[in-house]
């Protein structure tokens, strides 16, 4: 008799498979980076195309022309609206104080309903000075940036997304000086990300509603004779007699998609500006003929990321520098691109 080997269907690592709390993904871990910069960026997924490039990664095809599918993420400038400072608490970092910029865009009130009233530049400078005193006294353990997106710049919508980003470096004073310089200003993707570096992509996947166990967990469709009882796309049984309950490990129907996911080590092929990519000294439009399906025209800055990423078109996508890069990684520079497909994706 042959070896009986039937591993369970589906991974329990992602259980419970339920909808994400928010469509704006969370980043709870940050890489260590010696460079003082904002550790990541955010944008909106436009669609996919493909390119031909000279492979510069270590491997059999190095130096040869290869086909690479890429995802385009439009990244209008982020606005730094605040600084959040943390102190060292008993169980880890605790919020110490925040400083918000005094002159915010009117659309921010659509997202933040509790904007401070009677808050002018004088009050802003006073709070900023108080925070600087805390930093100089050594009471602050970390400084991070509070930013919001500006989707109205690309004609997507009016309500922005707000989020927090860590700052690279080891010196808290250097982090504060960087935050002090950037507050109240726009940040573009080219200022904080480098072409060729590896990124982690964090997003909420496409929602697929309620699905059965075959599609949701990958269980086998039952043998045709077993289907004579009436159905075949279900599990054979719900488990043993004892323990006298249905265990949570049993693959059953339920919610599929709209899950919070992180995909590691996606290479940033190129960064474009104003919807255009510089190729061999010439500017070419990145938008394909007829526009990206369900999205339209890319008008602002964009990221060209290798491979696929989670989420549907127009969904908010967050990236950060790779937190666990491989030992053999490609050089941090733009690879030589020989062709970009602009054929219709309709």
UniProtKB/Swiss-Prot annotation:
Does the UniProt entry include the keyword RNA-binding? yes
What processes in GO biological process is this protein linked to?
Answer: translation
Q: Which GO terms describe its molecular function?
A: RNA binding; rRNA binding; structural constituent of ribosome
- Which Pfam families does this UniProt record tie to the protein? Ribosomal_L3 (PF00297)
| Keywords, alphabetical | Ribonucleoprotein, Ribosomal protein, RNA-binding, rRNA-binding
Region feature Disordered, mapped onto this chain: 324-346
- Listed GO CC annotations: cytosolic large ribosomal subunit
Cysteine disulfide partners in this protein: none
Indicate yes or no for the key word Ribosomal protein: yes
Among InterPro entries, the record links this protein to: L3_arc_euk, Ribosomal_L3_dom_3_arc_sf, Ribosomal_uL3, Ribosomal_uL3_arc, Ribosomal_uL3_CS, Transl_B-barrel_sf
UniProt function note: One of the primary rRNA binding proteins, it binds directly near the 3'-end of the 23S rRNA, where it nucleates assembly of the 50S subunit.
Q: Which HAMAP family match?
A: Ribosomal_uL3_A
What NCBIfam families does UniProt report for this protein, alphabetically?
A: L3_arch (TIGR03626), PRK04231.1 (NF003261)
Q: Which family does it belong to?
A: Belongs to the universal ribosomal protein uL3 family.
Q: How does it assemble?
A: Part of the 50S ribosomal subunit. Forms a cluster with proteins L14 and L24e.
Q: What is this protein called?
A: Large ribosomal subunit protein uL3
Q: Which gene encodes it?
A: rpl3
């Amino acid at each position: 008799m042959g070896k009986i080997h039937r591993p369970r269907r589906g991974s329990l690592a992602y259980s419970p498979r339920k909808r994400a709390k928010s469509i704006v993904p969370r980043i709870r871990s940050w890489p260590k980076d010696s460079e003082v910069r904002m550790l990541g960026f955010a944008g909106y997924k436009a669609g996919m195309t493909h390119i031909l490039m000279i492979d510069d990664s270590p491997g059999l095809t190095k130096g040869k022309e290869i086909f690479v599918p890429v995802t385009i993420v439009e990244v209008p400038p982020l606005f730094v609206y605040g600084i959040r400072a943390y102190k060292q608490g008993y169980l880890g970092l605790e919020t110490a104080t925040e400083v918000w910029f005094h002159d915010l865009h009117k659309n921010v009130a659509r997202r933040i309903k509790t904007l401070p009233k009677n808050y002018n530049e004088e009050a802003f400078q006073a709070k900023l000075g108080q925070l600087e005193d805390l930093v100089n006294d050594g009471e602050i353990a970390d400084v991070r940036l509070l930013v919001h997106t500006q989707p109205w710049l690309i004609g997507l919508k009016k309500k922005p997304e707000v989020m927090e980003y860590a700052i690279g470096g080891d010196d808290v004073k250097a982090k504060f000086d960087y935050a002090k310089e950037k507050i109240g200003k726009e940040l573009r993707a080219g200022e904080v990300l480098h072409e060729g570096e590896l990124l982690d992509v964090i997003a909420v996947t496409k929602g697929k509603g309620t699905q059965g166990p075959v599609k949701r967990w990958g269980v086998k469709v039952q043998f045709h004779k077993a289907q004579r009882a009436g159905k075949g796309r279900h599990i054979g049984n719900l488990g043993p007699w004892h323990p006298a309950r249905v265990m949570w490990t049993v693959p059953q129907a339920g919610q599929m998609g709209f899950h919070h996911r992180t995909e590691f080590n996606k290479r940033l092929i190129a960064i474009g500006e104003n919807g255009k990519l510089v190729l061999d000294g010439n500017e070419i439009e990145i938008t394909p003929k007829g526009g990206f399906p369900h999205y339209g025209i890319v008008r602002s800055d964009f990221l060209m990321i290798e491979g696929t990423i989670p989420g549907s078109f127009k969904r908010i996508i967050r990236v950060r520098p790779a937190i666990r890069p491989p030992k053999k990684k490609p050089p941090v520079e733009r690879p030589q691109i020989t062709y970009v497909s602009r054929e219709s994706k309709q």
